[in-house]
């Protein structure tokens, strides 16, 4: 009897599926079309807010599930779960950090949308959505290494984390992209069971990311893809992984090549398995 399994793809956005400067995914279009044709679930995993991800998906219809605020929010089929800390806790820790460091500190939760737009290159409407945060807060600062250490220590003393993404350090809860990936797989397993009437024995997972905050997600995946940082070329691996691939190009161009290669490999290796795409 062939093994019943399902392929699921988890991807970071900024600097990975989306170009770091233009936020375009057009260079990934061939692989995206293939994923859509095969009905493979594609899950966005981002430090962006749920409002941002929902807006992107309303326009592009790329994603089957959304993981927002660095793993603090998991959304599938319009059902949302929050696993991150309260906004009050985030605000308290941020103010403690502000008092302890040696540089000015602002954040997405404390500035006007116009400043978020200037810092990110987003439109004003997109900047408004970027500020609608429930359980995380990207910092706007120019820290020294010592400032980062101080901020991380304060966050950890309160049970929170300070994580480095493609653009910002972000205060967030202990739930990371890897934890959220596991929660999403649990929910997908229920969805497949309800849809097909039989359980999925296992998932084959592919994860793509470019930043330190992607490490927990990459570590959980069967196939992990590290996207090089734009204008910096290839860099040392973010983690040790038995199946880590380094994409040949930054952003969506590298995403496209790496994902197509993995899908080719899975297809050629598992012709005798029953593959559930969606």
Q: Which ranges hold each PLM region?
A:
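Asp-based phosphoryl-transfer active-site loop
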Residues: 5-22, 218
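Anion (oxyanion) recognition and catalysis
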Residues: 36-37, 156, 219
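Conserved acidic, metal-coordinating active-site core of Asp-based
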Residues: 100, 104-206, 212
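Mg2+-dependent phosphoryl-transfer enzymes with acidic/Ser/Thr/Gly-rich catalytic loops
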Residues: 2-4, 25, 31, 169-278
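Residue-level detector of anion-binding/catalytic polar loops
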Residues: 41, 161, 223-224
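Residue-level marker for buried hydrophobic side chains located in beta-strands
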Residues: 9-11, 66-67, 207
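Phosphate- and divalent-cation-binding pockets in alpha/beta enzyme and binding domains
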Residues: 52-55, 115, 150, 216-217
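Active-site phosphate-binding/coordination module
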Residues: 21-110, 229-230
């Amino acid at each position: 009897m062939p093994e019943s399994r399902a392929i699921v793809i988890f991807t970071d956005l900024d600097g990975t599926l989306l170009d770091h400067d233009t936020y375009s995914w057009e260079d990934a279009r061939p692989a995206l079309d293939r994923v859509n044709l095969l009905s493979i679930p594609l899950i966005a995993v981002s430090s962006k807010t749920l409002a941002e991800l929902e807006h992107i998906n309303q326009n592009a219809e790329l994603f089957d599930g959304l993981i927002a605020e660095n793993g603090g929010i998991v959304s599938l089929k319009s059902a949302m779960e929050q696993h991150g800390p309260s906004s009050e806790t985030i605000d308290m820790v941020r103010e403690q950090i502000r008092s302890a460091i040696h540089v000015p500190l602002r954040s997405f939760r404390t500035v006007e949308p116009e400043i978020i737009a200037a810092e990110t290159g987003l439109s004003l409407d997109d900047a408004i959505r970027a500020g609608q945060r429930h359980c995380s807060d990207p910092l706007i600062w120019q820290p020294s290494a010592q400032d980062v250490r101080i901020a991380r220590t304060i966050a950890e003393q309160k049970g929170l984390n300070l994580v480095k993404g493609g653009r910002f350090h972000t205060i967030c809860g202990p739930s990371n992209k890897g934890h959220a990936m596991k929660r999403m797989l649990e929910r997908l397993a229920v969805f497949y069971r309800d849809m097909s009437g039989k359980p999925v024995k296992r998932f084959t997972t592919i994860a793509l990311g470019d930043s330190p905050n992607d490490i927990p997600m990459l570590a959980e995946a069967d196939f992990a893809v590290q996207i090089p940082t734009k204008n910096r070329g290839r860099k040392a691996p973010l983690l040790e992984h038995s199946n880590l691939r380094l994409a040949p190009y930054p952003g969506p161009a590298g995403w496209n090549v790496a994902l197509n290669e993995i899908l080719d490999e899975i297809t050629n290796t598992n012709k005798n398995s029953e593959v559930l795409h969606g």
